Curated annotation (Swiss-Prot):
Residues that bind FAD: G13, G14, G15, H16, A17, G18
Name this polypeptide is given: tRNA uridine 5-carboxymethylaminomethyl modification enzyme MnmG
Role of this protein: NAD-binding protein involved in the addition of a carboxymethylaminomethyl (cmnm) group at the wobble position (U34) of certain tRNAs, forming tRNA-cmnm(5)s(2)U34.
Pfam families referenced in this protein's UniProt entry, alphabetically: GIDA (PF01134), GIDA_C_1st (PF21680), SAM_GIDA_C (PF13932)
Organism from which the protein derives: Methylibium petroleiphilum (strain ATCC BAA-1232 / LMG 22953 / PM1)
GO term, biological process aspect, one: tRNA wobble uridine modification
A cellular component term, taken from the record's GO annotations: cytosol
InterPro entries: FAD/NAD-bd_sf (IPR036188), GIDA_C_N (IPR049312), MnmG (IPR004416), MnmG-rel (IPR002218), MnmG-rel_CS (IPR020595), MnmG_C (IPR026904), MnmG_C_subdom (IPR047001), MnmG_C_subdom_sf (IPR044920)
Single GO MF annotation: flavin adenine dinucleotide binding
Quaternary organization: Homodimer. Heterotetramer of two MnmE and two MnmG subunits.
Cofactor: FAD
Gene that this polypeptide is encoded by: mnmG
């Protein structure tokens, strides 16, 4: 039957990509339908019970800055929070949280059910309705036909998924859920370029059978307790739990090697390529044969369960090998496995077949997001989902696509990498992928993106007001640092050496003192207080606010979360100003031709002196801008120069020399 209501946007899949896509489209005013095979699994954490990490935490902050759900849901469900790389520079510091699976799923579902203009429907999707070269809806497994103006497909590992445990395998989307075989077959009929990838998960352990006295405890950060969302607070967190650390041994590795002859990975049963940076334990033992031990983290799955996730031993080995290997580790000698580990193979579609908006080049109105694009990880999926949901909504609203730049967001890096380079293995985000990472920090994601989110309708009034309070506070305190001067005579040498490293030779602005190595905001605030007190001796204080300027005073005025965020922003922006300025210059130089639009009808075979390889690649991929063309694998700077000359000379019909000038086109 044809459902009587037509929707603006249909989202297929209720995982991390699908939920963010549906919420984004609905926030932007589109009538949105989320189709899922099971409403009870909306927002389910199918693998590890954690959110964030290096590069990944940056994506979560960006999702949050755009009004997404992942960060707030993590704050409500997180049972341990840590800052990774805390001793390193601000660009690579990242938040990571262990999450209670039940609480996280409930937090996501609550947002879905209370989001205006968003409808849910429980049915697997078997087919897409396509007219000509455009999608106009979806068909469920019982034949209900839903019409829409755009469809966002976020099928995860369900497309022709197959689970492997040893040499046994069966069709599944994940453990306990059926695969989407009909939909996968339909997509292949549409001649979309596809391949196979694989990922895996470890066995789960009953915590009552773990000897914790033999393990190393790993607590979360306590002072201060991190939060993920710019709207979050540590008071939102439930009860906190520690993680625990054990190690594999040479005996463990012997057991694992003994199962290689029954491993689907080593016997050629699995054809899909797995994630390089999250290898299975059998892959680690094989590739790093010289290592006698690997660290394993035992992570609690939640407050209402005894289940533990042993991070570091993802495996598809036979169950008897899994059990023996686990029981060879310290503290796990009596371990009982609740769920076996497994690998899953699934279809993905080459992301080079997508436009910059994540709309497929072959089928108008059809957008892909998440693991279907060859990525791995909850955070990468959620970021793509939000991006695809935004652009599906903007297409419905007859607006240009939103395309964040590489220097603007990790989301921009993610999208650009996928559509220009494609994937040969599951793609995950790292800070090293971003050439402008000093600008793309966790602490300033809101300053980079919330304005754009508000303009697109993603950011509500409450978040917008909170953002403006922070932005105004940063501006005010930055000005105070620049305009407050300290005379050397007003700061005793002993205090100067204690606070800023050495006695002052002359008058300094506080901002210059803050730039010194080892000097933080608390130190310069105390400098200001001492100087103010000495200046005011014997007369009435000329500026009571200056006398009280301190972290404690700002916390009292704004609350701890905002005060600490503002201070962090001040310290980073001040100390790294020179580096940031240099990076801004690089951005400006790169932007000279980055956004130059390439004509859709450009024939690369007519560009003089291009190599056959470069012509083939550009003709096949058809990048949308010169910047994208420059990042295609095998395309050299010399090739880009030849292409630019071709465009400037107006050799492409309808593309005059004026069109190739810098700034003449915007992405």
């Amino acid at each position: 039957m044809l459902y009587p209501q037509e929707f603006d946007v249909i989202v297929v899949g209720g995982g991390h990509a699908g939920t963010e896509a549906a919420l984004a489209a609905a926030r932007m005013g589109c009538a949105t339908l989320l189709l899922t095979h099971n409403i009870e699994t909306l927002g389910q954490m199918s693998c590890n019970p954690s959110i964030g990490g290096i590069g990944k935490g940056h994506l979560v902050k960006e999702i949050d800055a755009l009004g997404g759900a992942m960060a707030l849901a993590t704050d409500e469900a997180g049972i341990q929070f840590r800052i990774l790389n805390g001793s390193k520079g601000p660009a690579v510091r990242a938040t990571r949280a262990q999450a209670d699976r039940v609480l996280y799923k409930a937090a996501i579902r609550r947002r879905l059910e209370n989001q205006p203009r968003l409808w849910l429907f429980q049915q697997a999707v078997d087919d897409l309705i396509v007219e000509g070269d455009r999608v106009i809806g979806a068909v469920t497994q019982v034949g209900v036909r839903f019409r829409s103006k755009a469809v966002v497909l976020t099928a995860g590992t369900f497309l022709d998924g197959r689970i492997h445990v040893g040499l046994q395998n069966y069709a599944a989307g994940r453990a306990g859920d059926p695969p989407a075989q009909s939909l996968s077959a339909r997509l292949k009929e549409l001649q979309l370029p596809q391949g196979r990838l694989k990922t895996g998960t470890p066995p789960r352990i009953d915590g009552r059978t773990i000897d914790f006295e033999r393990l190393l405890e790993q607590p979360g950060d306590a002072d201060p307790v991190p939060v993920f969302s710019y709207m979050g607070d540590a008071a939102m967190h439930p009860r906190q739990l520690p993680c625990w650390i054990t190690h594999t041994s040479e005996r463990t590795h012997e057991i694992i090697r003994s199962g290689f002859d029954r491993s689907p990975m080593f016997t050629g049963v699995i054809e899909g390529v797995g994630p390089r940076y999250c290898p299975s334990i059998e892959d680690k033992v094989n590739r790093f044969a010289d290592k006698t031990s690997h660290q394993i983290f035992l992570e609690p799955e939640g407050l209402s369960t005894h289940e533990f996730y042993p991070n570091g031993i993802s495996t598809s080995l036979p169950f008897d090998i899994q059990l023996a290997a686990l029981r060879s580790m310290s503290g796990l000698e009596q371990a009982h496995i609740l769920r076996p580990g497994y690998a899953i193979e699934y279809d993905y579609f080459d992301p080079r077949g997508l436009k910059s908006s994540f709309e497929t080049k072959a089928i108008g109105g059809l957008f892909f997001a998440g693991q279907i694009n060859g990525t791995t990880g909850y955070e990468e999926a959620a970021a793509q989902g939000l991006f695809a949901g935004v652009n599906a909504a903007r297409q419905v609203q007859e607006l240009d696509a939103w395309l964040p730049r590489r220097d603007q967001a990790y989301l921009g890096v993610l999208v650009d990498d996928l559509i220009t380079k494609g994937v040969t293995e599951p793609y995950r985000m790292f800070t090293s992928r971003a050439e402008f990472r000093l600008q793309l920090r966790e602490d300033n994601a809101d300053l980079r993106l919330t304005d754009a989110g508000r303009e697109m309708g993603l950011v509500d009034d409450e978040r917008w007001a909170a953002f403006n309070r922070k932005r105004d506070a940063v501006s005010r305190e930055t000005e105070r640092l620049k305009s407050t001067w300290v005379n050397a005579a007003l700061l005793p040498a002993a205090d100067a050496e204690r606070l800023v490293g050495k006695a002052l030779e002359h008058e300094y602005a506080l901002v210059d003192l803050l730039r010194r190595p080892g000097v933080d905001f608390d130190a310069v605030a105390e400098v200001a207080q001492i100087a103010h007190a000495r200046r005011s001796e014997g007369r009435q204080a000329d500026d009571p606010a200056a006398a009280a300027w301190s972290r404690a005073a700002l916390r009292n005025e704004w609350g701890p979360a905002l005060a600490d965020a503002v201070i962090q922003q001040l310290e980073t922006a001040t100390k790294y100003a020179g580096y940031i300025d240099k990076q801004n210059e690089q951005v400006e130089r790169a932007a000279q031709y980055e956004d130059l639009k390439l004509p859709e009808s450009l024939d690369y075979r007519q560009v003089a002196a291009l190599s056959h390889e470069v012509r083939q690649k550009l003709q096949a991929l058809r990048p949308e801008t010169l910047g994208q063309a420059a990042r295609v694998s095998g395309v050299t700077p010399a090739a880009i120069s030849l292409l630019l000359i071709h465009l400037k000379k107006g050799r492409h019909r309808g593309f005059g020399a004026d069109a190739a000038e810098p700034g003449s086109a915007a992405a």
